[in-house]
Amino acid sequence: VIASVRGHCYTGALELALACDLLICADDARFCDTHGKWGMVPTWGMTNRLPERVGPLVARDIMYSGRVVEGVEAIQIGLANRCVPEAELEATTNDWAETVATNSWHTLREEKKQMRLLAEMTREDGLKWAREKGPGVAPDMIERIQEGFKR
C-alpha cells in the first residue's frame, strides 16, 4: 500500500499514512500529530509505527511537541520515502505503483509477511527462520524467468 500525501496530514490522517508500506509526499505536504493539542491519545498505531519509521527520539519530538514536519524534512527523517513537486505527485505515485506491481505479488506478499514476523525476533533467530522456513522461491518464479529470457 502506497500513501500519497499532499497538503495537511495531521493526527488520524498521519496514523493512516503510517499504516501504509510506502509513503510519497508532495513538497507542500505537512505532517503533524495534534493528539496532545486536543487531549487525545493515538489508537490507530502511531505510537508503534512512528518510532519504527523515524526512530524513538524523532518520534517523541513530533508527538510531544505537535510540531509540523514539512515534505522535504519528511524525507530527511525517514517519515517519507520520496518527496516530489506537488504538480508531479499523482504521476510519480502512479509510476511507482506500476513499478512495484511489475514484481511478483507472491514475493511482495511474502516479503511483507516476513518483515512483520521477523521484526519480533532477534536478528539471529530471524536469519535462522528465513533460512529454514522461508519459501525461497515464489510460485511464479519459473514463469517470470522464462518471460525475462524472451525479452
Roles of regions detected by a PLM:
Residues 1-105:
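Crotonase-fold acyl-CoA enzyme core
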Residues 66-72, 87, 91, 95-151:
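C-terminal alpha-helix plus adjacent terminal tail
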